[in-house]
Design a protein with these regions (language model features):
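C-terminal substrate-binding/catalytic lobe of Rossmann-fold NAD(P)-dependent oxidoreductases
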Residues: 1-122
C-alpha cells in the first residue's frame, strides 16, 4: 500500500520482494499484478494469477508512505510478514547512506551490493 500520489504499480519494492521470493521458489514462474485499488477505494481485478505465478495486489490510499505484506496461506494456517513505513524519513536516510557508500566503491554498483554492505556492518 502506498500514498495516492504514487504512480507506478506495483511498486519497485513489491517487485523486488516478489523477485526475491521467486529466486527461492524454482517451482514458481513470475509474478502477476492481480488487483489494483485506486485512491477512491475502488478495487479493479486485473487478472487471475496462474497457479505457478506469484500474485501481487497494489493499493493506493491516503498519504500512506508504504506498507508491504507477504502472505503465505494454506488450508491449515496463514503467515503474514508486514513492513510499515511511518514516514518517508527512512527512504531519505537510505538514499543518503547509498550516496556516501558510492564514492568508496567506484564503478557500476547494484542495490544488492549496497544491501550486502549494510547487512555485513549491522
Amino acid at each position: 500500500m502506498h500514498h495516492i500520489h504514487k504512480l507506478d504499480h506495483p511498486s519497485g519494492t513489491a517487485i523486488t520482494l516478489a523477485e526475491g521470493l521467486l529466486a527461492q521458489r524454482p517451482d514458481m514462474q513470475g509474478w502477476v499484478l492481480t488487483d489494483l485499488t485506486t485512491p477512491s477505494g475502488i478495487t479493479e481485478h486485473l487478472a487471475d494469477a496462474p497457479q505457478q505465478a506469484l500474485p501481487i495486489a497494489s493499493i493506493r490510499r491516503g498519504e500512506v508512505p508504504g506498507i508491504h505484506s507477504i502472505e503465505w496461506d494454506s488450508d491449515a494456517d496463514s503467515i503474514t510478514i508486514t513492513h510499515s513505513a511511518h514516514s518517508r524519513a527512512g527512504f531519505a536516510l537510505g538514499a543518503v547512506m547509498a550516496a556516501e557508500w558510492l564514492p568508496r566503491n567506484p564503478g557500476f554498483r547494484t542495490m544488492t551490493e549496497f544491501m550486502d554492505f549494510l547487512f555485513s556492518n549491522a
